[in-house]
């Protein structure tokens, strides 16, 4: 029963396409070393950087060596 609730909440988060402010504040994904381009991941989080913001949905692949 709890697993279903977690999945529903997860789907709501994934479909929201909203920046995660907590992660954006913690990870500066606009830094040059993070390659602020679609498809690049924000630090160790499974989030992508789009225009300097960390998003839940990642349309690209994680860069090699990170």
From Swiss-Prot:
Signal peptide: 1-22
Source organism: Californiconus californicus (California cone)
A GO CC term attached to the entry: extracellular region
Disulfide bonds listed in the record: 29-49, 42-54, 48-58
Protein name: Conotoxin Cal6.21
Organism placement in taxonomy: Eukaryota, Metazoa, Spiralia, Lophotrochozoa, Mollusca
Compartment(s) of residence: Secreted
Role, per record: Probable neurotoxin.
Chief subcellular location: secreted
């Amino acid at each position: 029963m709890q697993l279903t609730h977690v999945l529903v909440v997860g789907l709501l988060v994934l479909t929201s396409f909203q920046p995660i402010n907590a992660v954006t504040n913690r990870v500066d994904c606009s830094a040059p070393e993070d390659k602020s381009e679609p498809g690049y991941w924000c630090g160790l989080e499974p989030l992508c950087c789009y225009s300097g913001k960390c998003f839940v949905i990642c349309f690209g692949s994680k860069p090699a060596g990170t």
